[in-house]
Amino acid sequence: ATMKQEIPYSSAQLLYYAWQLSRNRGGADDDKLTGVLSEARVDLNPHQVMAALFAFQSPFSKGVILADEVGLGKTIEAGIVISQFWAERKRRILIVAPATLRRQWSMELEEKFFLDSFILEKKKGISLDHLSDGKQIYICSYQFASRQAEILSRTHWDLVVYDEAHKLRNVYKSTPSMASRLKSAFSDSHKLLLTATPLQNNIEELYGLVSIIDDHYFGDLKSFKAQYCYSNKNDDIAFGDLRRRLRPIVHRTLRKQVTEYVKYTSRIPMAQEYYPAVEEQKLYNQISEYL
């Protein structure tokens, strides 16, 4: 099913809102994000404004999935959300990301949003007092979060951000996994899932991602399959119903929707296959485990 969020404003209006959020000082209650971004060093695009507003659409929401295509700035969108939580003094914030992206996240937060962060690593250990002090944003790898899930769960996180959240897509399976440990550890926290590929192999993966946010959103897996996988309904009707159900929790922007104001460089990709030697793969696995 294609998840496509309708944009109720013209491109000119969205450009104005993007400028307003980026440049204005202060702001009334109606302009929720204006004050947060008044000092942020970032040029916003209209679709990023829409994504940030979507994330705050309901005070009762347990979280959302931002599923823009690659290259549309999901990190910036998450930065806006994180900044708003920080401004509201909801400062127990954890970002779970691939190990290779932790430094990038730290730099983005500092350079674009002036937010301090600390990367949790095995060699540094964990202090529960520090995790709860709300003085900085914490960043860790998926492997670290999985290994330290019990300790991390003792902090009531105001916001947990999952970058490359498709890594959690198989959480619906009955076998214990990294995804199931993280789901349990942060079940009570507000969550923001970032992924360009919310659906890769089968529709159950979409069920899994949504269950990370709200375990009861679609009911149990058996009911979900009966309604959307093995339904007697016409496929168009079933997928139409699924899109309607996903609309409050999943926001997706496609590249073709933003070509009016985002100019892409024409590239000719060349793929070069590489197969690591046994020793190289072993070293890579050991470093990943250490991180």
Regions found by a protein language model. Give the residues of each.
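Charged, low-complexity intrinsically disordered regions
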Residues: 1-20, 206, 279-291
